[in-house]
Each structure stands twice: as structure tokens, then as C-alpha cells.
Regions:
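Glycine-rich, acidic/polar active-site loops that bind/position phosphate-bearing ligands
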Residues: 1-453
Length: 453
């Protein structure tokens, strides 16, 4: 037994923790959990916990359903909303086959595989997400319009702003679980919040994002509201993104930094961005996996820009340009370790493991193939005409999930990154979602057409 496992078992005894929740994520990014008693944990570290993989979205067929969840002791944390005695803790799991080999259906393994390839190239991949979400007074299940929890706007600080107390309690919980927070504030739409997590290695960040979502929903329930990570719940307000800053390090050196280069951006950094741009359309179905995701991307960002609504619609990059898909942020002089790129397409409903894996694969492809970075866009891309964008070589992102899936289906990069099992399941599941949406007669159609046709 290693020291981390010993620490977990000792902590369970010292803090009177009677329940240990073992977490993992299905292919669509939904959190799954099984609780074990502390007495069973030593065996779980050695052998894992068996479960029916065919009951988990995208994991296995019924005739090959036996799977194992093996806890990762490095992810052990006590759940702060179960602080009373006896307490409850959690660990993330790796999903294995009965013979002990990794399950190709496990999103965490998909990311681990991508990170192993990155390590072979001499890099460490870091990510830093800015997570937006809405607080709602209600959560109607009949499809009717929800009500935001407040009427505040961008950076508003008012006594009636429910978000202030919410963010304070949520951040306290996150930090008690070892998840560091950099910033928090009210976003541009009524009820919309943003909390930015401190950068970490990509696997830790993905685990943190999954924890973050549960903490937000838990705190919201305690405060009598509801938290949603739906990309765009209101047609007239900005949607919720998960802008993510990416960087590669070689040891302690930031591989994106080069003194004297334009924007201090190294050849590695420029090729990484070029890879993100070249493969942006084909990875879009992963980073923006819901029908609703494309309402955020194409839902009038030019009208809501400056109010937190800068969702990118076009494939381009720019220096400090929030209308671009990829932004090279400014950073303070001397802070060379802060050199990074920001991808602005992700929404807060994405599976972080799969999203980080395909973003990394796209960037590494640019490095390995020596992609040349096209000229940057320093103007407001939304304000340009279609002809002006075409002249600059700026193409649009997919208009909807169906278009994104068609591009993904033809992508060798996405297929290789996700692996055959996840790739095939994802396409089947999302095609079904798209077909259901296409055949749905919407309230918009009834409202517009029924009175006049």
C-alpha cells in the first residue's frame, strides 16, 4: 500500500468518515457515483469495485458489461456539505476491464492517453477554465421559461444580488476541497455567474470541473435556487461559456514564451494555435456537444458583446481580441510563465475530459506538422461583412450540431484521440439528439405560423 492510500485510510478513521463516494464520468460528461464503506476501501484500492458498465451511457454492451471502478487516492477529499459526523468523502476512479486493463470508454482515460503522448514529446499541459453558469429561481420541467435569480449585470455589486452570498459559500467549499479559485463575479446576464479556477495540469482541472458543477448545484439548493450549466437558457441574454486558457511547459519553462517574438509568442505557441484553428470545426461537436450549444455560438454574440456575450462564431485568432475563437491574452511584464492562449468556444456543458483531449490533440498536431499561423484578426470579427471575412480567410464555426457531427465524422484526429469506442458512441448518441430536435415542432413555429397559416 502506498503512502497516499495510507493517508486516505488514516483520515477516514481520524475524521469519522463512514461513507466514501467513488466518482467517475460517462461519455456525455455526467457524474456517476457509488458509495462504499471504509472497511471495503483497502480492497477497492487493490481490486476496484465491480459494476454493470452497460447501465452507464456509452460504456459497454450488455454482453460485455462487467467493469471495475478503481479509486485514485490522489483525488481524495472530504465533502464539505457532508461535514457533520459521520462524514462523507470522495475519490475519482479510473475505469478498468475485468483483466485490469484500462477501459477505452472511460473519458478520464481518453485524456490520460492524450497527456501521455504529450509527455512523450517533453511537454506538460496546463489548463485554466473560466466557468459561467446561471442561478434560477425555478427550473420548469415543462419547457417553459425559467426565471433568473436576480436582475444584476456585469460586475454588479448590490445588496439584493443573491450571487454574492452564493459565490462566497461556493468558493469556500471549493477551496476546502483543494480547488483554488482566482476570480469570481456576476456576469453579463441576469442571474449569470462566473468563477475562474486557478490553472492546474489538465487531468486535475477536468476533475475539478466535474467537482465544481456538483458544488454549484449543491450550494444553489441550500440557498433555494437552481444552478444550470445549459449553454444558452435565454435567447435574449448571453450564454454560458467555459473559456479555457491553455499552456505547455517543458519542465519549468513555458514553451509558449519567446523573448523578442511578436506578442512574445514562441514558434511552439504559434503552431499550437494554428492547430487549434485548423481543426476547430471538426472538434466542435466535442467542445460544444449539445443542440443548445450552437444557440450560444450563433445567438447574437455581436449584440451582447461587452456584456459577457463574446461567444466566438468565426475561426480566427487575435491578440487580446474577445471576438476571436483563440485569444492571446496580455500579461504583466516579467510574468513569462503566464504566456498562454485562450480558447473561447467551449461551453460549460462540455465533457472536460474529452474537450481537453481534442484541444490538446489539435494543438500538438500543429506543432508536429509545423502548421503556419495565419494573420491575426485585430478588428471586431462580428462587425466585418461576410466578404471582408472571406477576404481574410476567416471561416465560420459549424452552424448547428448536425453540421458539427458531419465534420467530426470525417475527422481522423478526433477518431484517433477519442478512440473507436467513444468516437462511435458519441456520434450515435448525438445524431439521435439532433434528429429528435429536427423533428420537434417548436413553440416558435406554433406562435409564428398557427395564427396565419
Amino acid at each position: 500500500m502506498d503512502k497516499q492510500q495510507e493517508f486516505v485510510l488514516r483520515t477516514l478513521e481520524e475524521r469519522d468518515i463512514r461513507f466514501v463516494r467513488l466518482w467517475f464520468t460517462d461519455v456525455l460528461g455526467f457524474l456517476k457515483s457509488v458509495a462504499v464503506a471504509p472497511a471495503e476501501l483497502e480492497q477497492a484500492f487493490d481490486e476496484g469495485i465491480g459494476f454493470d458498465g452497460s447501465a452507464i451511457e456509452g460504456f459497454a454492451r450488455v454482453y460485455e458489461s462487467d467493469m471495475i471502478a478503481k479509486p485514485d487516492p490522489a483525488t481524495f477529499q472530504v465533502l464539505p456539505w457532508r461535514a457533520e459526523t459521520p462524514g462523507t468523502a470522495r475519490m475519482f476512479c479510473d475505469i478498468l476491464m475485468p483483466d485490469g486493463s484500462p477501459s477505452f470508454a472511460d473519458p478520464r482515460y481518453v485524456l490520460k492517453r492524450a497527456l501521455a503522448r504529450t509527455s512523450d514529446l517533453g511537454f506538460t499541459f496546463y489548463t485554466h477554465p473560466e466557468i459561467e453558469f446561471f442561478l434560477l429561481k425555478d427550473r420548469p420541467l415543462d419547457g417553459s421559461r425559467p426565471t433568473p435569480a436576480d436582475n444584476s449585470g456585469y460586475f454588479d455589486h448590490t445588496p439584493t444580488n443573491v450571487g454574492m452570498d452564493f459565490r462566497r459559500q461556493a468558493i469556500t467549499m471549493l477551496e476546502s476541497m483543494g480547488i483554488s479559485v482566482e476570480f469570481s463575479h456576476h456576469e453579463g446576464a441576469p442571474g449569470q455567474q462566473e468563477i475562474d479556477l486557478r490553472y492546474a495540469d489538465a487531468l486535475s482541472t477536468a476533475d475539478n470541473v466535474m467537482t465544481f458543477r456538483l458544488v454549484m448545484k449543491q450550494v444553489a439548493l441550500e440557498q433555494g435556487v437552481h444552478a444550470t450549466f445549459m449553454p444558452k437558457p435565454f435567447s435574449e441574454h448571453p450564454g454560458s461559456g467555459m473559456h479555457t486558457h491553455l499552456s505547455l511547459f517543458e519542465g519549468d519553462r513555458n514553451a509558449f514564451y519567446e523573448s523578442g517574438a511578436e506578442y512574445q509568442l514562441s514558434k511552439v505557441g504559434r503552431s499550437f494555435i494554428a492547430g487549434l484553428l485548423r481543426h476547430a470545426a471538426e472538434i466542435s461537436a466535442v467542445t460544444n456537444q449539445w443542440v443548445n450549444s450552437y444557440k450560444r455560438i450563433w445567438g447574437g454574440s455581436e449584440r451582447t458583446a461587452g456584456a459577457g456575450g463574446e461567444a466566438p462564431s468565426y475561426i480566427c485568432w487575435g491578440h487580446n481580441n474577445r471576438s476571436a475563437l483563440v485569444r492571446v491574452p496580455m500579461y504583466k511584464p516579467g510574468k513569462t510563465g503566464s504566456a498562454r492562449v485562450e480558447v473561447r468556444s467551449l461551453d460549460s456543458g462540455a465533457n472536460p475530459y474529452l474537450s481537453y483531449a481534442v484541444l490538446l490533440a489539435a494543438g500538438l498536431k500543429g506543432i508536429e506538422e509545423g502548421y503556419e499561423l495565419p494573420p491575426g484578426a485585430e478588428d471586431d470579427v462580428w462587425a466585418l461583412s461576410n466578404a471582408e471575412r472571406r477576404a481574410m480567410g476567416i471561416e465560420p464555426l459549424p452552424q448547428n450540431l448536425g453540421e458539427a457531427l458531419t465534420l467530426m465524422e470525417g475527422s481522423d484526429l478526433v477518431a484517433e484521440t477519442l478512440g473507436e469506442h467513444v468516437f462511435d458512441f458519441f456520434l450515435r448518441n448525438k445524431r439521435q439528439e439532433w434528429e429528435e430536435y429536427r423533428s420537434e415542432v417548436t413553440a416558435f413555429e406554433l406562435r409564428k405560423n398557427l395564427p396565419v397559416l
